[in-house]
Design a protein with these regions (language model features):
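N-terminal leader/targeting segments
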Residues: 1-87, 134, 138-140, 322, ...
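Hydrophobic alpha-helical segments of integral membrane proteins
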Residues: 219-231, 242, 250, 258, ...
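Non-globular, low-confidence helical/coil segments that flank catalytic cores
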Residues: 157, 164, 168, 188, ...
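Alpha-helical transmembrane segments of polytopic membrane proteins
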Residues: 23-33, 369, 481-486, 544-548
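Membrane-interface helix/helix-cap signal primarily in integral membrane proteins
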Residues: 58-269, 629, 637-647, 653, ...
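Alpha-helical transmembrane segments of integral membrane proteins
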Residues: 158, 297-301, 342-348, 447-450, ...
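Hydrophobic alpha-helical transmembrane segments in multi-pass membrane proteins
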Residues: 3, 11, 198, 253-476, ...
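Hydrophobic alpha-helical transmembrane segments
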Residues: 1-4, 215, 247-252, 314-320, ...
Length: 858
């Protein structure tokens, strides 16, 4: 089954990237199938190879026939143009309430539209998914409006699955940040059936009579909410939030810092419900049933039913269902006494899931789930069978000399050594205790070795997906997992027992609740302690294609060699170890052009971020985007938007970063950039009183980054480019708070070509710059996102730009860039580029000319 799954997977990849007419695949599959039938009895190996060829062709056919099918009516996207719409819908996925900006709270729900009315026209029957954010105000902390366990109530009434509602909203289509390396948010929503985004005030939502949806899902949703309410009644809020995530799969109450600690320590799989939860649950249930003398078949059936029920309750999605399917197949094949049942279970589960949805092959979740199990089954277990498991079997009847005669010499000698140790300790603790202690010590040592080895192989094998998808080298993952995994194995059954007993009597739940609390606090303490080490925070660029192939090849080599002689197995393990080291500590060559000055305006929405690469390869990042205003944002623009682009470019460290001024849409993402890329210098200009600026400078100093103040008149070289600081004036007093005219304005030149970077400078600064310097530039980074109070005619007359780029957010509430600014730029003869329409824009200045390049066209 494993070979069939691999052939089907390769076929899916071929079908996705090498399109051919469908009849090609059909004819090929039929030809291979008939040839396989002909050779089935004559030449068995050839027949099997032909069967795999047919499976390969069926995989290619399947992914092309399925196409990029959407799960919604695309007509809703035609209505998502800013018009006020009247919408009738029903909730298909509810969520918890969370704090929002300015003292409000929000609940994100997915709704399926029933009828949409626009401009007073008759309602259109539209079936499509919308992610709706509902806002309320002045909330008190509570879990649910009808939760008896939580004190207080939230003014925002939470909406639940199946409720029919009517509301008015302006819809907008989901939009990706159009930078290479960016997360495909639009594709993620489409895969979940979401075609548009919208928001509404709670008081403007009208409840409609009736119910829409599945009664089974309604029951599941109610059970899910009930369990979460019970968790928050049994544990303090901080512990409850972690149990929600670790046991139930509800991550709404986990803050970003906690999430980052688990990621840095390489234990993120502990924080989220994953296949490990299913395996722990299956083991505990099966072991308990067998100890109660339940038969093998009934115990297997009850265990599988328990896993299915758990997957249904958590609603985590594909990872848990994949693990449940693998568990069911593994336990089923175990009943048939099939060898290597784990590999067969893995192949069958993968094949079944890919037949259901072939494109999940390209998701990080699918790949990491199956790579984990494949590493354990193909490398870990075969190695343990000849090491720790080999000796563990020697502990059976270990006092019997006759039993030892049938064992290999080294194992028999191991038994003799244990008996000698027991004999020497007998005088201290007695004969029976000495025998028990020696046997328990041997079992513990062998178990510890197995845990260490599996954890080490797992971390080495996962180095490639961790580097490629998450840009992390998990240097402390081995000790963290060795400490945390056993605690999780204790916490999981204790938490389940606590919740179950909590429905009977809170008094009965106290002891397992205490055990759970101790385990959770030990887990978080370990994670924070190890994740907080500087050694743990190693970020890596996207590996090169050659590095990906080499690391994957090393993993395959280790799997092939694991069942061969010991020297061959060691060679395979060393290859995986070398690949993991290379991924973590050997940076790829950056994707830059030599002997040109590059200026890239990164798409950060309604913010600002510019990457400069000098002719000699030195790098400078000016600003790092951020949210508008002081409100909270679900995005960390530095971590989620700017850093992925820099990693895609192969950049592992920046030479310098600059902040033009202290507004959040320019510096909101800079803290993450400082941590991820450890620049040598941080350039600043005016520093008015600002907690955000003070925190940023303190962060830079704690990281050993030199803070450099720059003023009008400063001029210096950087990697073959010349930089002149045109603003702020050296004698300019800082205001009471950050202002646009605090902006650090830079002119960067290379031979006879130059660029002017304005930040958010406005008329006052522009007039002073024009009068003092009369700057010229081929490229103008338009000030203040194209606002009318910047980009004055006087500046344009002096600069005479051939190109201009505006960093602006799509459908921004400020209606930027202003029409009059675009008209001024057009009259000046500048060709205008905008990040809201073109995405990231790169300009190459070779000293004599400027060449623009759009990321969307690469």
């Amino acid at each position: 089954m494993l070979w069939a799954a691999l052939a089907y997977s390769v076929g899916i990849v071929a079908g996705e990237y090498a399109w051919r007419p469908a009849h090609w695949w059909v004819v090929g599959a039929l030809a291979f199938a008939m040839a396989a039938a002909y050779f089935a009895q004559r030449r068995v190996c050839l027949g099997r190879a032909l069967v795999l060829g047919a499976v390969f062709l069926v995989g290619a056919l399947h992914v092309q026939v399925r196409g990029a099918a959407t799960h919604f009516d695309t007509s809703i996207q035609e209505l998502a143009d800013g018009r006020e719409l009247q919408i009738m819908a029903h909730v298909i996925r509810d969520g918890q309430s969370r704090p929002a900006s300015f003292g409000e709270i929000r609940q994100a729900v997915d709704v399926e539209t029933e009828q949409v009315t626009a401009d007073g026209a008759p309602g259109l029957p539209v079936r499509s998914g919308i992610r709706l954010t509902i806002y309320g105000s002045h909330a008190r902390e509570a879990l649910d409006e009808d939760s008896e366990e939580s004190p207080g109530a939230i003014p925002l009434r939470l909406f639940h699955y199946g409720e029919r509602i009517h509301f008015s909203a302006k819809l907008r289509p989901p939009r990706n940040f159009r930078n290479p390396g960016a997360f495909d948010y639009q594709g993620y929503l489409a895969a979940n059936g979401i075609a548009a985004l919208g928001s509404a005030k709670a008081e403007n939502i009208e409840s409609l009579p009736g119910f829409a949806g599945s009664r089974i899902e309604l029951w599941r949703s109610r059970m899910h909410r009930s369990v979460i309410a019970k968790v928050h009644a049994l544990w303090p809020a901080r512990v409850a939030a972690l149990i929600d995530a670790m046991v139930i799969g509800e991550e709404a109450f986990i803050d970003r810092d906690t999430r980052t600690d688990f990621q840095r320590s390489g234990t993120y799989h502990i924080l989220v419900v994953s296949g490990m939860n299913v395996s722990i649950l299956a083991f505990v249930v099966f072991w308990t049933l067998r100890r109660l003398r339940v038969g093998d078949v009934p115990a297997t059936l009850l265990t599988v039913c328990g896993c299915v029920g758990y997957a249904f309750l958590t609603e985590v999605g594909a990872p848990v269902w994949r693990a449940t399917l693998m568990c069911a197949i593994y336990l089923g094949t175990r009943l048939l006494y099939r060898e290597r049942a784990m590999l067969n279970a893995l192949g069958a589960a993968a094949l079944g899931l890919l037949v259901f949805e072939p494109r999940q092959l390209f998701t990080a979740s699918f790949q990491m789930t199956f790579v984990c199990v494949l590493i354990v089954a193909a490398i870990g277990l075969p190695t343990l069978e000849r090491t720790s498991e080999f000796y563990k079997r020697a502990l059976a009847h270990w006092q019997s000399e006759d039993y030892g005669k049938s064992l290999p010499p080294r194992v028999a000698q191991f038994r003799v050594d244990l008996r000698l140790i027991a004999g020497r300790t007998r005088q201290f603790v007695g004969r029976q205790w000495s025998l028990r202690l020696v046997r328990l010590s041997a079992r513990f040592a062998l178990g510890a070795f197995a845990l260490l080895f599996i954890s080490a192989v797992m971390q080495m094998g996962l180095a490639l997906p961790m580097a490629y998808y998450f840009h992390r080298a998990t240097t402390v993952a081995l000790p963290a997992n060795v400490l945390v995994v056993p605690l999780t194995q204790l916490m999981m059954p204790a938490a389940v027992a606590t919740i179950a007993l909590g429905y009977v009597s809170p008094w009965l739940a106290r002891i397992p609740a205490l055990v759970t609390t101790i385990a959770v606090q030990a887990i978080t303490g370990t994670v924070r302690g190890l994740g907080g080490l500087r050694l743990a925070d190693i970020r890596v660029p996207t590996p090169s294609t050659m590095m990906v192939l080499a690391a994957a090849g090393a993993l395959v080599l280790a799997m092939v060699m694991a069942r061969r002689r010991a020297p061959a197995a060691i060679v395979g393990l060393l290859a995986v170890f070398a690949a993991a080291l290379a991924l973590g500590f050997i940076a790829p060559l950056p994707n830059i052009r030599a002997n040109v000055l590059e200026i890239t305006s990164i798409d950060v929405g309604q913010g600002d971020s510019t990457l400069l690469v000098t002719p000699q390869g030195r790098t400078l990042l000016v600003d790092a985007g951020g949210p508008i205003g002081e409100g909270s944002s679900q995005l960390d623009f530095g971590e989620d938007v700017v850093s992925p682009y820099l990693w895609w470019r192969g950049i592992s460290r920046l030479d310098a970063v600059a902040i033009t001024h202290g507004h959040s849409d320019h510096i909101g993402g800079m803290a993450a950039v400082l941590k991820n890329f450890r620049p040598r210098e941080l350039w600043v200009g005016l520093l008015p009183p600002s907690a955000a600026l003070e925190n940023l400078i303190a962060e830079a100093q704690s990281l050993g980054i030199k803070v450099v103040r720059h003023w009008q008149g400063d001029a210096f070289a950087l990697g073959g480019a010349n930089i002149s600081v045109l603003w702020p004036a050296r004698d300019a007093p800082p205001g009471a708070k950050p202002q646009n005219n605090d902006s650090l304005v830079l002119r960067v030149s290379y031979i006879d070509s130059a660029a002017l970077l304005e930040g958010d400078a406005q008329k006052q600064a522009e007039r002073d710059i024009t009068a003092r310097y009369h700057p010229t530039a081929d490229l103008l980074r338009v000030g203040h996102h194209g606002s009318a109070n910047a980009t004055t005619p006087e500046l344009l007359e002096s600069v005479k730009p051939r190109f201009a780029v505006i960093s602006v957010g799509s459908r921004n509430p400020f209606r930027l860039p202003r029409r009059e600014v675009l008209d001024r730029l057009e009259r000046s003869g500048a060709r205008v580029f905008r990040t809201d329409t073109e995405g990231a824009v790169t300009f190459y200045l070779d000293g004599h000319s400027v060449t623009p390049s759009l990321a969307a066209l690469r």
